[in-house]
Amino acid sequence: MAGRKTTRKRRVRKNVESGVAHIHSTFNNTLVMITDPRGNAIAWSSAGALGFKGSRKSTPFAAQMAAEAAAKESMEHGMKSVEVAVKGPGSGREAAIRSLQATGLEVTAIRDVTPVPHNGSRPPKRRRV
């Protein structure tokens, strides 16, 4: 077993001009995933993956950094414009969208795809702090 080579999978450059940026903003974290129009993942990032811990993950600044990291990675694959699909009630929604625009990606549309129940299951009880 000595001298065995491990081969790492080479990153393939996907040539994708436009795609969809899915921003999932929860009360605890913000996830940004950039896909092609069919839904195949090209790049992703989150506040936790960037090293933010605990309550710092839920800040708008952490969401901004996550969106910036995902946008830079997707631009290496040739991405130029994105539609934005925002989901969730978190504080990082607007910051992530602004960050995508600031990195040089053209935002063509913004959709809110937050799931709204038609009176489904009972929600968790209200916090008393």
Swiss-Prot record:
GO terms, molecular function: rRNA binding; structural constituent of ribosome
Similarity comment: family membership: Belongs to the universal ribosomal protein uS11 family.
Range of residues in the leader sequence: none
Protein name from the UniProt record: Small ribosomal subunit protein uS11
Underlying gene: rpsK
Keyword Transmembrane: no
Keywords, in A-Z order: Ribonucleoprotein, Ribosomal protein, RNA-binding, rRNA-binding
PANTHER family: 40S RIBOSOMAL PROTEIN S14/30S RIBOSOMAL PROTEIN S11 (PTHR11759)
Keyword Ribonucleoprotein among record annotations: yes
Record-level GO cellular component terms: ribonucleoprotein complex; ribosome
Biological source species: Lacticaseibacillus paracasei (strain ATCC 334 / BCRC 17002 / CCUG 31169 / CIP 107868 / KCTC 3260 / NRRL B-441)
Subunit description: Part of the 30S ribosomal subunit. Interacts with proteins S7 and S18. Binds to IF-3.
Species classification: Bacteria, Bacillati, Bacillota, Bacilli, Lactobacillales
Free-text function comment from the UniProt entry: Located on the platform of the 30S subunit, it bridges several disparate RNA helices of the 16S rRNA. Forms part of the Shine-Dalgarno cleft in the 70S ribosome.
Family matches, as InterPro entries: Ribosomal_uS11, Ribosomal_uS11_bac-type, Ribosomal_uS11_CS, Ribosomal_uS11_sf
Superkingdom to which the source organism belongs: Bacteria
A Pfam family it matches: Ribosomal_S11
SUPFAM superfamilies named in the record: Translational machinery components
GO BP term (any one): translation
